[in-house]
UniProtKB/Swiss-Prot annotation:
One of its GO terms (biological process) is terpenoid biosynthetic process. The lineage of its organism: Bacteria, Pseudomonadati, Myxococcota, Myxococcia, Myxococcales. Catalyzes the acyloin condensation reaction between C atoms 2 and 3 of pyruvate and glyceraldehyde 3-phosphate to yield 1-deoxy-D-xylulose-5-phosphate (DXP). Keywords: Isoprene biosynthesis, Magnesium, Metal-binding, Thiamine biosynthesis, Thiamine pyrophosphate, Transferase. GO terms for cellular component: cytosol. This is 1-deoxy-D-xylulose-5-phosphate synthase. It comes from Myxococcus xanthus (strain DK1622). The gene is dxs. One of its GO terms (molecular function) is 1-deoxy-D-xylulose-5-phosphate synthase activity.
């Protein structure tokens, strides 16, 4: 590899290069990104597609004096490489290493913490107005990409920005993809002559469409945008996965998230785990339910791939609805389906469900509609980090009246939970983690629908301590209790409503450890304490869960161990509680 990229320590070095050197810089950036993702994994496709665009941005604008705000962060590995982080990129997504997305605490060149989509325009307009009020100079650029024009927040920002007359620059990295192909009318409109009329009608000067891999054309368009005194949209057409044949050949996601892998002799070599994931297992039981009952439909906000729904979409094309990166719409659309007699299952990540909290309350729970929420990535998600942790769903959903909140311990729990939820006259949540399925403990049955309440995994004849768990932590609790006399293990299974009889029995053991992979503030442990207080039950209780902090990226297994949420940690907590001490 040439030494060109090794001489780039900041964007000023990009501006100092002769223009004829920029194509080589782009080539080296792609080689670095492919190599990095091969070693540690990551969001490959969007970053490869945005290489020329990011080089052109740093050629024309002067970061950090000019603020560059990227939507999501999927597309930003070249930006990281050009802003002084190349020597640490091998730590990408690892504990203590480079963040998976963008974070201003990592670099002054990251003007916006970006992990969720559709935030860049609103934030950029705020930055521009704030700078104007403070008398600060400098340009502000919002870079949209990976489906940013399928979400409502972007249009709220465009509406406000177009009416403001402020010189906001919006760069649309149009690769026709979010994770998979974009859906709906807007992405189709962008590839027509009406795109100009659309943006000009919103009050923007429209520049484009520009070939997003033609550096001279990009630089000309960005310089024109920089010189404008009013809002501008630069529309760049790019190819997600450009420069890496396996990504370009991947028609579903264009190499959205890949690695680790090896690229040898023109061939991609990847190790593939044979274990089934919770997502795949849930998709299978949902497929069975859809085959049995034509009223059952699936809804997802741009998560066909992530929630393992592609096979369902192929089998039931008219009953699987990908609505784009539009979580609020997904929930209210599901409410409408339910009100018309369908049985919608809204498949959504825990972290993205946060974006539709009002719709859950107002549009689903208040009218009492039987929507089922399949909440994927509940708990720790590992390398995707703080913006994607699923550690707040129990605490936020538990207070909602008549919403039943299920959490499977093993894959065998999914079918009876879904059957129970589909038969219920109210809303239900089935929350399951990222990762592979644990084995069903010996002698344990999953039960049959309708499920009712908690499940004893281990019941001591003379109990002196009970481990109460939610989800797969029951497996660790069983291991922790093995060989400990008088220890019981209760899988709460449903965080709301509680199985009061089982939990009060647990409390009468005198010592209770409640373990959950989520915040303890308002979570299952809080619910258990509320129950004990209401019944005047005096037990020693220890709550185990996430700290009062945002959990960063890292290995989820290590993070569980750090919080005592493995077998050894739970055993240690139980023994300390019995001894009357702390941790």
């Amino acid at each position: 590899m040439s030494e060109l990229l090794s001489r780039i320590g900041s964007p000023s070095d990009v501006r100092a290069l002769p223009e004829e050197a920029l194509p080589l810089l782009c080539q080296e950036l792609r080689e670095d990104i492919i190599s990095i993702c091969g070693r540690v994994g990551g969001h490959l496709g969007a970053s490869l597609g945005a290489v020329e665009l990011i080089v052109a941005l740093h050629r024309v604008f002067h970061s950090p004096q000019d603020a560059l705000l990227f939507d999501v962060g999927h597309q930003t590995y070249a930006h990281k490489l050009l802003t002084g982080r190349r020597d640490r990129m091998h730590t990408l997504r690892h504990a203590g290493g480079i963040a998976p997305f963008l974070d201003p605490r990592e670099s002054p060149h990251d003007a916006l913490l970006a992990g969720h989509s559709c935030t860049a325009v609103s934030a950029a307009l705020g930055v521009l107005e704030g700078r104007r009020q403070q008398g600060h100079r400098g340009h502000v650029v919002a870079v949209l990409g990976d489906g940013g024009l399928t979400g409502g927040l972007t249009f709220e920002g465009l509406n406000n920005a177009g009416g403001s007359s402020l010189p906001l620059v919006v760069v649309l990295n149009d690769n026709q993809m979010s994770i998979s192909a974009n859906v709906g009318a807007i992405p189709a409109l962008l590839r027509t002559r009406e795109a100009r009329d659309f943006f000009e009608g919103l009050g923007f000067t429209y520049l484009g469409p520009v070939d997003g891999h033609d550096l001279p054309a990009l630089i000309r368009a960005l310089r024109e945008a920089r010189a404008s005194s009013r809002p501008v949209v630069v529309h760049a057409l790019t190819l997600k996965g450009k420069g890496f044949p396996p990504a370009e050949a991947d028609t579903q996601t264009r190499g959205h998230a890949m690695g680790p892998y090896e690229w040898r002799d023109g061939k991609l070599v990847r190790s593939r785990g044979g274990q089934r994931t919770f997502s795949e297992a849930f998709a299978a039981v949902l497929e069975d339910a859809m085959a049995r009952d034509p009223r059952v439909v699936a809804v997802t906000p741009a998560m066909l791939e992530g929630s393992a729904l592609n096979a369902l979409k192929a089998r039931f094309p008219d009953r699987v609805h990908d609505v784009g990166i539009a979580e609020q719409h997904a929930v209210t659309f599901s409410a409408g389906l339910a009100s018309a007699g369908a049985r919608p299952v809204c498949c959504i990540y825990s972290t993205f469900l946060q974006r539709a909290y009002d719709q859950i309350i107002h549009d689903v729970c208040l009218p009492g509609l039987p929507v089922v929420f399949a909440v994927d990535r509940a708990g720790l998600v590992g390398a995707d980090g703080a913006t994607h942790q699923g550690t707040y769903d129990v605490a936020s959903l538990r207070p909602l009246p008549d919403l039943h909140l299920w959490s499977p311990m093993v894959g065998e729990d999914l079918a009876p939970m879904l059957d129970t939820a589909l038969a219920a006259p109210h809303a239900s949540v089935i929350r399951f983690p990222r990762g592979t399925l644990p084995p069903l403990p010996e002698g344990l049955g999953a039960g049959e629908a309708p499920l009712r309440g908690a499940r004893w995994l281990l019941r001591a004849e003379q109990p002196r301590l009970t481990l109460v768990t939610l989800g797969p932590l029951g497996i660790a609790a069983l291991e922790a209790a093995r060989g400990e006399p008088g220890w019981s293990v209760l899988d709460a299974r449903c965080a709301s409503p509680l199985d009061e009889a089982a939990l009060l029995e647990a409390g009468r053991s005198g010592h209770v450890v409640v373990a959950e992979e989520g915040t303890t503030r308002g979570g299952l442990g809080s619910a258990v304490l509320e129950l004990f207080a209401a019944h005047g039950l005096m037990a020693r209780v220890r709550l185990m869960g996430m700290p009062d902090a945002f959990v960063p990226h890292g290995d989820a297994r290590v993070q569980r161990a750090e919080q005592g949420l493995d077998a050894e940690g739970l055993r240690r907590a139980g023994l300390a509680l019995l001894a009357g001490g702390g941790r």
